[in-house]
Amino acid sequence: MAHALETVERSKILIDHPLLSANNGRYSYKIERKGDQSLYSVTDGITTIIMPIRWAMGASSAIGQTYILEKDGQLYESRMSWFQQLHGLGPTLGSAGVLPADLHEAAGRLMSHGDKLACFGCHASNAAHGDQLTLDKMIPGVQCGHCHQEVEAHLASMLEKSGQPIFPPKLSKLSTEEMSNFCGQCHRTWAEIAMQGNPSIANIRFQPYRLTGSKCYDPDDARISCVACHNPHEEVSAKAEDYDAKCQACHAGGKAEANACPVSKSKCVTCHMPKIELPGGHYKFSDHHIRIVRAGEPYPG
């Protein structure tokens, strides 16, 4: 999470790939490294637009990286992103098949104030104060204070050594439902996606939303919470067997509502949380809608 956003100077992907190029329709794109900066350009063969890359979002991840561009004081989301699976550039998620009206639109999508709050608010720390962007005080990546709120007030109260000390909320005391909503502030909650009214495979990457739809989901059972399987202070394990003990915490047998699997007791998530390709995302996400998956069944949106 500490690399959810990187400055262009420190982006390993941009450093390791000093020249990237791709075509999309009638437009040609290029990202070139110049010293410790990277320039993003798009041309229609007649006119060329060049923008400096300011930040890389999703930096150095196994999935990909989208770029935040700047021109005339405005920020833009790059129309092309880098994808690990492609080892190169491809249309940014959500822009595939979209026909830009002109060269400027082909370069990137103008970010609204709400876009900036949402993107920087989840990919960085101290990027906003209420509804006010504070990019001058922003710390790239998800740092301690992003989740452990009120740490500054806690530090100040301890240094003063007078009065009642202030302690940050204990996240370990959150119920499963509260934890889903807490993580869902960035990973999307059930309520947020359900209110959009668009149940589709595009929601595969929103884990709290998908988890809530599982038959075994219990808002008060800590064994099905986000942190029961994932330690936010560590990288997510890609080994299926690393989650077996978590599954067996409920499915060891003895309870009718949580029978042991008759097929296997190892690599449970391989069958019950299958990896599904996100269209346009060039990555297979583990579906957190835990279930008995049957061949040929439609995707449970």
Positions of predicted regions on the chain:
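C-terminal substrate/ligand-recognition segments
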Residues: 114, 123-127
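Short glycine/proline-enriched loop/turn "hinge" motifs that connect secondary-structure elements
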Residues: 111-114, 219
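Primarily the internal scaffold of c-type cytochrome electron-transfer domains
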Residues: 1-60, 66-68, 89-104, 126-301
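A short, surface-exposed interaction/processing loop segment used at functional sites
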Residues: 72-111
